[in-house]
């Protein structure tokens, strides 16, 4: 999961290239470095680790007297925030999940089993929301991948993960440009509204329920919101099909890409009002 956290705030291609060149960070590395009684009080527990403010460029933090011997800067991650995220997540798993993340996931899902899929998702994302430097979007994306990794062995995990939807700016903008948000009378700016009632995620779930995903792969579940959302992202992303994005469309004008497969039925709404 820590490696996946690197894929935020930058293109996937750049993030992957950096990881390949410099490597990531592992549980065992952090465990060996923190030890039983770290000099910096912030590293003593998950709840104490806040306001670290480690800055890779300036080589500074909120407790400079301990910086030279601190393990946080010792890993060559892309920026200091990612170093903080790695240690914050380690402390979460150690102190909140009892060093057994899979068992914690099982327990959280079991506690929410009778409350519906949304409650199950919140049972996982909610407690992790306070891990430093990770947004709901990144948590949802990462947890979805983990939960869907073993469909045969953990079908209950797969059911929750397959219904997790990640709304990034590309997907939101596609729903604006195509006129889908306007068609649902759900126009809103990118952000938390995307996950609210009649927001992007809600609309994608409604759309997914009408698409039998088994037509794309017989092994898929009939209703597969995560796949539908990812397909839309892939259509837009520069690292994907690179069609519906600001590289190819002037945000102030209607789309002019007549080669787009949905051009004839697209609302072609300008993203920005002049």
How should each PLM-predicted stretch be described?
Residues 1-274:
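HhH-family (HhH-GPD) DNA N-glycosylase catalytic core used in base-excision repair
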């Amino acid at each position: 999961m820590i490696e996946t956290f690197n894929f935020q705030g930058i293109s996937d291609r750049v993030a992957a290239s950096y990881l390949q060149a410099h490597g990531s960070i592992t549980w065992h590395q952090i465990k060996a470095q923190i030890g039983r009684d770290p000099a910096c009080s912030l590293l003593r527990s998950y709840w104490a680790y806040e306001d670290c403010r480690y800055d890779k460029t300036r080589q500074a933090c909120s407790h400079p007297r301990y910086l030279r011997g601190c393990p946080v800067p010792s890993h060559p991650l892309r920026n200091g925030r990612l170093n903080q995220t790695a240690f914050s997540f380690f402390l979460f798993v150690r102190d909140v999940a009892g060093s057994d993340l899979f068992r914690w996931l099982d327990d959280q899902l079991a506690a929410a089993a009778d409350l519906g899929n949304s409650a199950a998702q919140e049972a996982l994302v909610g407690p992790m929301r306070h891990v430093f430097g990770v947004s709901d979007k990144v948590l949802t994306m990462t947890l979805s991948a983990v939960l869907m990794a073993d469909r045969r062995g953990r079908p209950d995990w797969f059911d929750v993960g397959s219904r997790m939807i990640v709304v990034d700016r590309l997907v939101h903008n596609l729903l604006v440009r195509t006129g889908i948000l306007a068609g649902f009378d759900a126009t809103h700016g990118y952000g938390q509204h995307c996950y609210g009632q009649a927001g992007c995620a809600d609309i994608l779930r409604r759309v997914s329920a009408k698409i039998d995903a088994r037509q794309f792969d017989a092994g898929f579940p009939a209703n597969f919101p995560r796949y539908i959302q990812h397909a839309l992202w892939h259509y837009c992303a520069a690292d994907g099909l690179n069609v519906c994005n600001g590289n190819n469309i002037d945000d102030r004008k209607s789309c002019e890409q007549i080669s787009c497969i949905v051009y004839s039925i697209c609302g072609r709404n300008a993203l920005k009002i002049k």
